[in-house]
């Protein structure tokens, strides 16, 4: 019983050097070692910390760098989609262009070359019409299917097949070059202040032409229709054309100027056609003013004509009458006529409804002469001995153009003698020269 076991002996009486490594002394000298990697492969199970953790939303907001990269990729995607759509559209259009080119070549083959130019007289139905050419009679022809029927109207210019004369195209109506030349692009420099006297004439033309274009509501309030046109008549040089220039300067309306002799054309029908084109352009550019100078060239009294030229002039005048007072309202188009011989005009041209106001331009009186001399000598360097009252009070019949010619001639005489001032003697010589040429060149009693 007194003997212990071997294990007991070791624990109690063993030597110090016989201690095991797992003793208390080894725990103090041992360093920390990380735990070994888990041998389990798979997702780590998260520990639940109660119902609060299950209800909380996870924080999945991306960082700023990730957001910028996402926007960049979206923009690249948009560009790629645009490129894809563009390529697909080009692929679809390529056969269409080839087909259009093929159709165009077929149309050209059907039209033939060369093509004739004619005029459409009447449309019978959707596929047939009556046409005429400048050198032949009228024909009943067909209209090809590719011709735009909406643009076909009687009187328009068309393209016809060279052999069968069918309608194969339409010529777009453009402005006649002669009418485009008649349009005054730059306003004249003359104004109402440059006109000496003629206060009553200026007032009348303002009421008949200028005021209806600028304030048409005044005529509507009073219940009247403004005049369609006026005629200016009087002796040469009394200011008819000058007043028309002043009207063009004072208003912003389109101004078309034509001389009566320009309406007389060589070929049959060209004169009336030019009149129609003139008023058509004026209607398109309205508000506008049509000024026809020397209207007596085409507006003379009608009589039995024996030549083709005289009959053509009468046709031109009839077309002018139709344009002045036809079924179509002129609207904002005003007409100004000017002539030296109103007694030779046809009464139908001067009746109310066509020309509602007739404005007479008499020779200037003493007050008007003085004003005209002041206007034309305002920029001249005059000597001290010049007395314009002598020329103002003279009994000779001066027109405004004569007074201007006297002032111009006096300045030329001063330049001839190397002088920069115009003397009284220069005016006297200029007056004698101008009046002598006037009496010599005009037959007696022409403008009585």
Swiss-Prot record:
Record-linked PROSITE patterns: AAA (PS00674)
Region (Disordered): 1-56, 93-112
InterPro entries reported for this sequence: 26S_Proteasome_ATPase, AAA+_ATPase, AAA_lid_3, ATPase_AAA_core, ATPase_AAA_CS, NA-bd_OB-fold, P-loop_NTPase, Prot_ATP_ID_OB_2nd
Keyword ATP-binding: yes
Keyword set, alphabetical order: ATP-binding, Cytoplasm, Nucleotide-binding, Nucleus, Proteasome
One MF annotation (Gene Ontology) recorded for this entry: ATP hydrolysis activity
SMART domains (alphabetical): AAA
Hydrolase listed as a keyword: no
Cell location: Cytoplasm; Nucleus
GO terms of biological process kind: proteasome-mediated ubiquitin-dependent protein catabolic process
Positions with biased composition (Gly residues): 1-16
Binding site for ATP: 234-241
Biological function: The 26S proteasome is involved in the ATP-dependent degradation of ubiquitinated proteins. The regulatory (or ATPase) complex confers ATP dependency and substrate specificity to the 26S complex.
Descriptive protein name: 26S proteasome regulatory subunit 4 homolog
Gene that encodes it: TBP2
């Amino acid at each position: 019983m007194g003997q212990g076991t071997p294990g007991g002996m070791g624990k109690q009486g063993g030597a110090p050097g016989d201690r095991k490594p797992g003793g208390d002394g080894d725990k103090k000298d041992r360093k920390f070692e990380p735990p070994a990697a888990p041998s389990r492969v798979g997702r780590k199970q998260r520990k639940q910390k109660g119902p609060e953790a299950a209800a909380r939303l996870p924080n999945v907001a991306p960082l700023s760098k990730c957001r910028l990269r996402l926007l960049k990729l979206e923009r690249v995607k948009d560009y790629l989609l645009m490129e894809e759509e563009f390529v697909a559209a080009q692929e679809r259009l390529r056969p269409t262009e080839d087909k259009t080119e093929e159709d165009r070549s077929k149309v050209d083959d059907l039209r033939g070359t060369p093509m004739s130019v004619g005029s459409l007289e009447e449309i019978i139905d959707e596929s047939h019409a009556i046409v005429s050419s400048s050198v032949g009679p009228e024909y009943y022809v067909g209209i090809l299917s590719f011709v735009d029927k909406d643009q076909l109207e009687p009187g328009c210019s068309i393209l016809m097949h060279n052999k069968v004369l069918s309608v194969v195209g339409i010529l777009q109506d453009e402005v006649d070059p002669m009418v485009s030349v008649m349009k005054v692009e730059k306003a004249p420099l003359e104004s109402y202040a440059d006109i000496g006297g003629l206060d009553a004439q200026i007032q009348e033309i303002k009421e008949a032409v200028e005021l209806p274009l600028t304030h048409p509501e005044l005529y509507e309030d009073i219940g009247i229709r403004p005049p369609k046109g006026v005629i200016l008549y009087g002796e040469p040089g009394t200011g008819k054309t000058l007043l028309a220039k002043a009207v063009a300067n004072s208003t912003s309306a389109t101004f078309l100027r034509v001389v009566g002799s320009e309406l007389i054309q060589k070929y049959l029908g060209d004169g009336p056609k030019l009149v129609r084109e003139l008023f058509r352009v004026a209607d398109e550019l309205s508000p506008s003013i049509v000024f026809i100078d020397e209207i007596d060239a085409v507006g003379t009294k009608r009589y039995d004509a024996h030549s083709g030229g005289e009959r053509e002039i009468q046709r031109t005048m009839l077309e002018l009458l139709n344009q002045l007072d036809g079924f179509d309202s002129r609207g904002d188009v005003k007409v100004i006529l000017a002539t030296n011989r109103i007694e030779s005009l046809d009464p139908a041209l001067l009746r109310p409804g066509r020309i509602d106001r007739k404005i007479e331009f008499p020779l200037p009186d003493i007050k008007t002469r003085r004003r005209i001399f002041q206007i034309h000598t305002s920029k001249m360097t005059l000597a001290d001995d010049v007395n314009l009252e002598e020329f103002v009070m003279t009994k000779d019949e001066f027109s405004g153009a004569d007074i201007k010619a006297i002032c111009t001639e006096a300045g030329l005489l001063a330049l001839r003698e190397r002088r920069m001032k115009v003397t009284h003697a220069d005016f006297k010589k200029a007056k004698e020269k101008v009046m002598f040429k006037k009496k010599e060149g005009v037959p007696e009693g022409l403008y009585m």
